[in-house]
């Protein structure tokens, strides 16, 4: 009987000790002075809950990805960087289109002669068109074309010089304005006019020489002897 009584007493002591330890742990936990093992257990529950929430958030993102749409063509992109590059390309295209329209309007407002020669060429040839082709007797013209002397032509060369001057004046009146001519054509026609002037001058010199020679021959034929 005694050993059994002693065993029962020891069991009661163990139970009491266990109850006391449990009460002590609860009091320490309520005061915030729990042991490290208890704290680690609590933290493990917290980390597991946070990991599950993060995993759920990732699954939601994969299930419903964010989409960015273009403001110009309504094209959809899955990143803001790709959308920004696409919209910058749209802006460059619109800038080039506006610049092309501006140049087109500017060119259409210019006169037709400006397309062939440019602004400087038009003003230069327009000023040249206002200059006289023939200067006065005493002064040279601005274009460098000298006027011929106004000496009297011989009678037998009158028709030739008159016809040449008529042809020369007709060619001048038939030419278009210098402002609408090409520079190469203008120089060629000025050279042709100079050649015709040189021919007329040569004919004048030949006629003057022939008239002097005929006068000299007639002077020789005169009989200067006195007849009584």
Swiss-Prot record:
Q: Name one GO cellular component term.
A: nucleus
Give the induction note: Induced by white light in dark-grown seedlings.
GO terms of molecular function: DNA-binding transcription factor activity; zinc ion binding
Instruction: Give the location in the cell.
Output: Nucleus
Q: Any one Gene Ontology biological process term?
A: abscisic acid-activated signaling pathway
* Keyword Transcription set for record: no
From the Swiss-Prot or TrEMBL record, give the protein name.
Zinc finger protein 1
- Protein source organism: Arabidopsis thaliana (Mouse-ear cress)
